[in-house]
Swiss-Prot record:
GO CC terms, sorted: centrosome; cytoplasm; myosin II complex
Superkingdom field: Eukaryota
Descriptive protein name: Centrin-2
The encoding gene: CEN2
Entry's family note: Belongs to the centrin family.
Residues passing through the membrane, by range: none
GO biological process: positive regulation of regulated secretory pathway
Keywords: Calcium, Cytoplasm, Cytoskeleton, Metal-binding, Repeat
GO MF terms held by the record: calcium ion binding
Impact noted for substituting G44A: Abolishes Ca(2+) binding to EF-hand 1 domain
Keyword Cell inner membrane: no
């Protein structure tokens, strides 16, 4: 399989494929390679049987009903086989499932030691100190502002989750 298969895509298609929370461009390329490997007839589509084999090769233990439901949920075209973008949606959904969200919630709780449901400047100062990081208040305030989506001076769990699942930061 060729690395860099996204390079020939249009800028819009490339952005659509690469802008996936939790996935780097290289990871998307690996998923593309798995998709192509299991697209046994070279049609650019994977049927339920091919999808099951592809998901298992990527380390997901799935049963047939799950695969068929995934195809029904993701196939926006005709209820038949799925294309690469739909396959990538399935993988992205699997990676962003409940377990990873729960893991991020545990990390959030380590910051939110006063259990207010938000991370404040005070929380950031404490964590920086515990980690032995010497950061100025201005640097910590800037971190807070970058993650704070509504400008209230606090980082909600949703803000934190968005930052933790993003590969590039604003």
């Amino acid at each position: 399989m060729q690395r860099g298969a996204l390079r020939g895509a249009s800028p819009t298609a490339r952005r659509r494929l690469v802008d996936r929370p939790g996935l780097t461009e290289d990871e998307i390329e690996e998923i593309r390679e798995a998709f192509n490997l299991f697209d046994t007839d070279g049609s650019g589509m994977i049927d339920p049987k091919e999808l099951k084999a592809a998901m298992q090769s990527l380390g997901f233990e799935t049963k047939n009903p799950t695969i068929y439901q995934m195809i029904a949920d993701l196939d926006r075209d005709s209820g038949g086989p799925i294309d690469f973008e739909e396959f990538l949606d399935a993988i992205t959904a699997k990676l962003g499932d409940k377990e990873s969200r729960e893991g991020i919630q545990k990390i959030f709780s380590l910051f939110d030691d006063d259990r207010t449901g938000t991370i404040t400047l005070k929380n950031l100062k404490r964590v920086a100190k515990e980690l032995g990081e010497t950061m100025s208040e201005d640097e910590l305030r800037e971190m807070l502002e970058r993650a704070d989506s509504n400008g209230d001076g606090e980082i909600s769990f949703e803000d934190f989750y968005a930052i933790m699942t993003k590969k590039t930061f604003p």
